[in-house]
């Protein structure tokens, strides 16, 4: 299976850079020249500066209108770079990594996603976006809600990561984001690494594409890992991967249409009964009842790793909170703006024009 990672904006390019570290094909697109130069693993020829004619390589200051315009203006250059990377080999999935709350990512990702859908109709386009932390305030929240709306009409699935679930209470934002970025890559990379790999029961690219072809609905990746010698119940470990503690998005599990579970570990631990008991519970709990599964016994492994992908999700508390909060902020802002305009008009009402005060002072002939 072939996947290409395209990072957009500061958050997205940092995530793509980590994917590049673990040998994925990756591109970085940003409006900030310094942010592109900061990357460590994506080769310079795969770093694309957009919007230089608008912001001079200095970023868009979390303004998605500028981010959108930057991507639109330089879209031919971007698509040419992508075409060069794609070459003559088919791409199964384009993963677009970005931050929902930023400017370049929130504004530019829908533009690029639409172009990719048109140029590569046989490839899936999947958005992987990090939701803003509560501490980040109003603007990122509004950016996120609007971007969710736009992307849901374009991409095949939106894998949303709720940063608020991952941030520890004593961490500052920069520490939290670094940990979150690595965690995102760990989960996605662990899943993709098992696609088309021989196993007791194998997941192939068509299985993954079926699960992610979900009409712009939400998806989430669950994860659980443990030392094989310390596992008392394999079923419990698998179940943990698709319960709230294992998921990076607060979702109503019962609303999911599809599930995909990959289990990797030493063969003596991968007991069939425990695996099927856990998968039976998952199939009973999700609405669609369709579970794809892969089992990968490996005598070299000392840990058991479980990756779960749930898609076709339309009910998520994390998403609802973002959208409801954004609507409230927007209403309050529009009300304050209207009240300010009214007060200004009331204050200035009745003032004369210059001609009323200085009649005949200027010879108009």
UniProtKB/Swiss-Prot annotation:
InterPro entries: CetZ, CetZ_C, FtsZ/CetZ, Tubulin/FtsZ_GTPase_sf, Tubulin_CS, Tubulin_FtsZ_GTPase. GO terms for biological process: cell division; microtubule-based process; regulation of cell shape. GTP binds at residues 10-14, 103-105, 136, 163, 181. Its main location: cytoplasm. GO terms for cellular component: cell division site; cytoplasm; microtubule. It is found in: Cytoplasm. It comes from the Archaea. Keywords: Cell shape, Cytoplasm, GTP-binding, Nucleotide-binding. GO terms for molecular function: GTP binding; GTPase activity. Belongs to the CetZ family. PANTHER family: CELL DIVISION PROTEIN FTSZ-RELATED, TUBULIN-LIKE PROTEIN CETZ. Involved in cell shape control. This is Tubulin-like protein CetZ. It comes from Pyrococcus horikoshii (strain ATCC 700860 / DSM 12428 / JCM 9974 / NBRC 100139 / OT-3). The lineage of its organism: Archaea, Methanobacteriati, Methanobacteriota, Thermococci, Thermococcales. The gene is cetZ.
